[in-house]
Amino acid sequence: MNIFDEIGDKESVFKDKKYLDHRFLPDRLPHREEQIRSIAKYWVEALNGVTPPDITIYGKTGTGKTAVAKFAMKQLKEASKDCDVNIRTEYIRCTDYTTEYQVIARLCQQLGRDVPYRGWTKAEIVNTFRNMFKKNAFGQDMILMVVLDEIDILLRNDGDGLLYTLTRTDNVSILSISNYVEFKKFIKPRVRSSLRDREIVFPPYGAQQLVDILEERSKMSFKEGALDDDVIPLCAALAAKEEGDARYALDLLRTAGEIADERDSDKVLGDFVREAKDYIEHNKITDIILTLPSQQQRVLEAILYLTKRKEEITSGRLYEVYKEIAKGDSVSYRRIFDFINELEMLGLISTNTVSRGRGKGRTNIIDLQCETSLLEDSLWGV
């Protein structure tokens, strides 16, 4: 028997796993109706031929930002079929397109212009893009709603040139998405003043809200009776502790189901959820560390060294050890503070400011937030 047929014929707790993928866009987004309506009240202006204001949405990972933006795009596209306005919506993930040139080239291609991803000057690509917003053959102005997901990554990598170009192009409205509430510090005042964006905050999901989301998805994903009663509440409770991360909750539920299949169990048990948690945490931290820039990996290496020596880790002591590890290829002391903030934002370390007493000032104490063995495995593969 063919091995793929044999595996495919095995009994499974799943009906269809795709509904547990965070990229799946359902017909309803529980507990995000208010945020959808907030976007819609601005974007509705496009249906009347008016370019909507720019929007920025903030929130931690897994709070529904991308799903809500795509849901609003889908709804606007459907509504625009019945009006005499040329509305286009385009989604750009800034982890895939990390420079102004790449984003503008991608937009040109999506809008019907065959332009190269390299080889043209910046002026050529920008002019080609802007010329698309002149009257078309039918005498209609095109209004473009462009969603820039994880925009902080592009801003750190390439500066604010993209926002400068887009805010100075007629009939373009920007919806920026960021996990990082302070990403605007990467935007120069002249660009920030022309952005004039409306801000929408996405709060973390609560445990009961996560239960509601998981129950809807599980009905489409699992066979009837395949989930033990405590599975969904446990997934929701664990995800609520992870700052209300719905993506994490879905990963837990899917991975627990996969463990059930591996064990030839006809039921997903709470113990499988706990195993899934350990598996996901290990892989998540490893993936984060492996994708860090080399200088940040060296900072982590220095923190690991000091942690294993049970030393108190101050920023000054950290910089001393980091310079020894970097061996002449080190960054400035000020830059280390940026790295510390970014590593804390990723959940790999924590910082605590303590007072040294009268006249001695205050000091940042740094603590590692993952197991030393896991960090060693990730950094050195031992």
Swiss-Prot record:
GO biological process: DNA replication
Keyword Cytoplasm annotated: no
Entries under InterPro entries matching the protein: AAA+_ATPase, AAA_22, Cdc6_C, Cdc6_lid, ORC1/CDC6, Orc1/Cdc6_arc, P-loop_NTPase, WH-like_DNA-bd_sf
Keywords: ATP-binding, DNA replication, DNA-binding, Nucleotide-binding
CDD domains named in the record: AAA, Cdc6_C
Superkingdom field: Archaea
Post-translational modification comment from the UniProt entry: Autophosphorylated on a serine. Phosphorylation is stimulated by binding to MCM. Both single-stranded DNA and double-stranded DNA inhibit the phosphorylation reaction.
A Pfam match: Cdc6_C
A GO molecular function held by the record: ATP binding
Binding of ATP, residues: 63-67, 205, 217
Subunit structure: Monomer. Interacts with MCM via the WH domain.
Job of this protein: Involved in regulation of DNA replication. May play an essential role in origin recognition. Binds to DNA, with a preference for origin-specific double-stranded sequences. Does not bind single-stranded DNA. Inhibits MCM helicase activity but does not affect its oligomeric state.
Free-text note regarding domains: The N-terminal AAA+ ATPase domain and the C-terminal winged-helix (WH) domain are both required for DNA binding.
NCBIfam families: orc1/cdc6 family replication initiation protein (TIGR02928)
PANTHER family named in the record: CELL DIVISION CONTROL PROTEIN 6 HOMOLOG, CELL DIVISION CONTROL PROTEIN 6-RELATED
Xref: HAMAP family: ORC1_type_DNA_replic_protein
Similarity section: Belongs to the CDC6/cdc18 family.
Official protein name in the record: ORC1-type DNA replication protein 1
Primary gene name: cdc6-1
